[in-house]
Regions:
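Terminal amphipathic alpha-helical/low-complexity segments used for targeting or macromolecular assembly
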Residues: 68-155
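Structural signal for interior beta-strand "rungs" in well-ordered beta-sheet cores
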Residues: 1-71
Length: 155
C-alpha cells in the first residue's frame, strides 16, 4: 500500500495485491491476489476485483471486475451483495441500473442522465451515479454479455 491511500472498512486484499499512491478503496470491497491498482484510481463499496489483473480506471460500487492486462466490469458482485444481506429486489434494481449504464450503448453522460430519471430516489443507484460523476481517471467498461456468460460458465 503506497502513500496517501484511503482504505475503507472491512476490505480484503489478497496476496501480492498492490496499491499505488492516492488510491481509494470503498467499504466491503475485495481486491484479488496479484492485482495492481494504478495511482488515483477509486474502487467503490462492495466491489469484487478478481486476481491477476491491472486496474487503471475507477470501478463503480457493487460491481465485479476482472481480466488480465486491464480489468473490465463483468456485472454486479451478486454473491458479495447477497452475503451482505442485500435483498433480491435491491439486487434486481442494481442489475437494471447496471444494464442501463453499461450495456445499452449510451454515452456515459447520457446514461447517467437516463438513470437519474429512471431510478430517482433509489440510494444504491444514486451512489453509483455520484461515483461515476466524480471520476477523474474514467470508469472501467463492461464486457459484452456473451463474454460475461462465458465467464459465468467457467466459474
Amino acid at each position: 500500500v503506497a502513500h496517501d491511500c484511503r482504505l475503507g472498512n472491512h476490505i480484503i486484499m489478497a496476496n501480492a495485491a498492490s496499491l499505488a499512491g492516492h488510491i481509494t478503496i470503498g467499504d466491503h470491497s475485495v481486491i484479488g491476489g496479484l492485482t495492481g491498482v494504478l495511482q488515483f484510481v477509486r474502487v467503490g463499496d462492495y466491489v469484487m476485483v478478481g486476481g491477476c489483473c491491472a486496474i487503471g480506471q475507477d470501478i463503480p460500487p457493487f460491481t465485479f471486475a476482472a481480466g488480465g492486462y486491464r480489468a473490465h466490469l463483468y456485472g454486479l458482485n451478486t454473491v458479495g451483495l447477497q452475503r451482505h444481506g442485500f435483498s433480491a429486489d435491491r439486487i434486481a434494481s442494481l442489475r437494471k441500473a447496471f444494464d442501463l449504464l453499461f450495456r445499452e450503448g449510451h454515452r456515459t453522460a447520457e446514461a447517467i442522465r437516463l438513470a437519474k430519471k429512471e431510478f430517482k430516489g433509489q440510494a444504491d443507484v444514486a451512489k453509483i451515479l455520484a461515483f461515476m460523476e466524480g471520476t477523474k481517471r474514467g470508469i472501467s467498461r463492461a464486457v459484452s454479455l456473451d463474454t460475461e456468460r462465458e465467464f459465468d460458465q467457467q466459474v
